[in-house]
């Protein structure tokens, strides 16, 4: 299980163009259930709504891999995702925002790409403050998860 997790992380890092500064990663001392609950509460505290929780571990297990808990939490501000999708259809692949959360040896890890990086690909002046707010809010969400014991 640990080996599979390390392989998946290595694959994601080596196969994508993502560099370390393009990712936001936080480790929580909470068990998976507590960290998931804290993550959802932190998302709500920033004014967002969880729209979907996708179980990744089921797909991996169906392929024969033994894995611990692994989810992707999708979230967005009510109305904002729809408005942005309507005005900027090419932004749809990045909506709603998401955070991967998985268990690892008694800890829980959260990871996502930095929303502020979207400014490089979507230079519309109206989007810059949106991307910056998303990144600031995500930092607050991750801080809450990291600091909650």
Language-model features: locations:
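Bacterial N-terminal signal peptides
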Residues: 7-16
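Compact, glycine-rich, soluble single-domain proteins
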Residues: 44, 48, 53-97, 101
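Beta-strand/loop substructures that line and gate deep hydrophobic ligand-binding cavities in soluble
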Residues: 98-123
């Amino acid at each position: 299980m640990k080996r599979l997790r390390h392989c998946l992380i290595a694959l994601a890092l080596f196969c994508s163009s993502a560099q370390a500064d393009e990712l936001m990663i936080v480790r929580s001392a909470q068990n998976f259930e507590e960290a998931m609950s804290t993550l959802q509460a932190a998302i709500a505290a920033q004014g967002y709504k969880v729209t979907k929780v996708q179980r990744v571990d089921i797909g991996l297990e169906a392929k024969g891999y033994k894995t611990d808990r692994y989810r992707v939490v999708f979230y967005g501000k009510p109305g904002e995702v729809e408005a942005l999708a309507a005005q900027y259809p090419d932004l749809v692949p990045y909506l709603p925002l998401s955070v991967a959360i998985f268990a690892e040896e008694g800890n829980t890890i959260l990871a996502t790409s930095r929303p502020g990086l979207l400014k490089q690909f979507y230079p519309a002046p109206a989007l810059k403050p949106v991307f910056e707010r998303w990144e600031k809010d995500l930092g607050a969400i991750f801080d809450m998860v990291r600091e909650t014991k």
